[in-house]
Swiss-Prot record:
Name by which UniProt lists this protein: UDP-N-acetylglucosamine--N-acetylmuramyl-(pentapeptide) pyrophosphoryl-undecaprenol N-acetylglucosamine transferase
Domain of life: Bacteria
NCBIfam families, per the entry: murG
Primary site of residence: membrane
Binding, UDP-N-acetyl-alpha-D-glucosamine: 17-19, 129, 167, 194, 250, 269-274, 295
UniProt KW Cell cycle keyword: yes
Source organism of this protein record: Shewanella sediminis (strain HAW-EB3)
Subcellular locations according to the entry: Cell inner membrane
The EC number(s) this enzyme carries: 2.4.1.227
Pathway: Cell wall biogenesis; peptidoglycan biosynthesis
Amino acid sequence: MTTVNTDKRILIMAGGTGGHVFPALAVAKYLCQQGWQVRWLGTAERMEARLVPQHGFDIDFIDIKGVRGNGLLRKLAAPFKVIRSIMQAQAVIKEFKPDVVLGMGGFASGPGGVAARLSGLPLVLHEQNAIPGMTNKILARIASQVLCAFEDTFDNVEAEVVGNPIREELIALGDSNVDPVTDDALKVLVVGGSLGAKVFNDLMPSVTAAVSKTHSITVWHQVGKGNLQGVKAEYQHLGQDGSVNVAEFIDDMEAAYRWADVVLCRSGALTVSEVAAVGLPSLLVPYPHAVDDHQTKNAQVLVQAGGAFLLPQTILDANKLIGKLQILASDRNELAQMGLRAKSAAVLDATQKVASVCIRLAGKD
């Protein structure tokens, strides 16, 4: 068991979505292994409130929500809420006395980052997406060090490209995931996020039925909360229930990636980084309502490497999906080459790079 050194303390701010929380957890676990004491700053209503304690880390909460909105009362109240949340973050910092603060996105990062600088602490920012969120755009002006996953993420701010931290088990999977090309059924992993992706749920039953007429295909489809029965019934109606595993959630993504030949998914930053790390080809459908369309830019890294196909949702239909899957089912050599090209775009030491910057700025190297 790692001995925690109470003279090495870091406050990590990340929350709201898995794209923020899981990379931060990777860094937290690495630093914990190096003897650091880790404390988390988040919000009580978002996923970090459940996930962070499950992974063994203490978490403090501040009261802050998104400030984008058009209501007059919302706009008038926003400055007072932000000031209150900064004061709450300052209280956490005063009690915990961290040596460095790491912000990785989410509502708590804004007030926490300001509180860190007001307290005279080094602030490290990490932006996971190819286009930064509003909070990181603002904090980048006052941060001690800005890190990012992709080239040309920030305008007029010097940032070091380090990649996205991902779980160690997925990096290990990528090292062993180079399987020989086989003539077995094409294994398609469909991942739509915690709420599922309606476009995948609507199209994949008929797509699977069409592809199965010419090629052997099996599907593992994560449909999201509340969608299980409807999607499962549609697969059954089309006679595909025997070749499909339909689930609301996939708890073990390592097992899912190990099983898959190709992934149909959104192009959130974490998903893109994980697919690259495990060396899987992908069909990327960016979420069309993402802020600043950042998912399309995220996808370009794998598309330009030749490891993925980009399928904008505005032009996506069953025929396009059928065509892509038939091509991949027919040419297993190309499927394998796409996986290798995806792997070539992966950054596998991002966790260590982020941690080393935090250690250096804390003066603990």
